[in-house]
């Protein structure tokens, strides 16, 4: 994560002192293992697949994502709090029913836990389940309409245009591509899908290993799933500094404070997230 923080111009020292204080981020994923970086970082774990009460991650994807957002040492916003909803199984696959249960739980508990951000490092390929796609889109947009910052992955079906996954195609949510991955999902300007909003590093990102007991605390993973929590963490930094911002304001600020990579808009959106610029704006 040190490499990532250099790339996105993470501000050490005074500008990052708050580092997510007062912000709760929901992670909808495969779960979270109690990795040393994540002790005390989660205020709630809800297993919507197997109904278990203990923290666990039978895939590793969710633990990795959680570490990027709020790992004690490596996280983008180490003072943010996490709520982890397990909506993906041990293979990393999901079911529309579990995701919809997650969306409903968030809406019902938004005020209780001061939920400001939802990280969705998953997606459905467009055209595979039309009814399911509509439900997922509606669920994500309901969160946005309630003032929550919804940050979702662009998917890894690129480089062809129009390869953004669901719910990333929504005009409301913040869709994140990977700046250094040719397979990052692309928008389609011909179809007026002006996506992604921005990009972040997504190749060989080192974060928490769910199988840390084997002595390997960190593991590298790649994809827009890894780029997305970088942006969620940045949003937590911003909301910690300026808690009265609306989700629309957060979206505009993120896009206005990017570094242009001189790539096509369908690949980079507004550009590479620049956190120093974001917090100095």
Where are these regions (language model features)?
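Autoinhibitory propeptides
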Residues: 1-14
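Subtilisin-like serine protease catalytic core
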Residues: 14-26, 30-44, 52-97, 113-116, ...
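Extracellular S/T/G-rich loop segment that most often corresponds to the catalytic His/Ser-adjacent loop
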Residues: 23, 29-32, 168-240, 278
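Glycine-rich, acidic and aromatic/proline-enriched surface loops and short helix-turn segments
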Residues: 30-33, 71, 105-111, 200-204, ...
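Extracytoplasmic/secreted envelope proteins and their assembly/folding machinery
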Residues: 62, 66, 100-103, 137, ...
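Hydrolase catalytic cores
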Residues: 66, 83-89, 163, 202-268
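Substrate-binding/access-modulating region of protease and related hydrolase catalytic domains
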Residues: 72, 88-172, 180-182, 190-193, ...
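Secreted peptidase-domain scaffold signal
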Residues: 155, 275-281
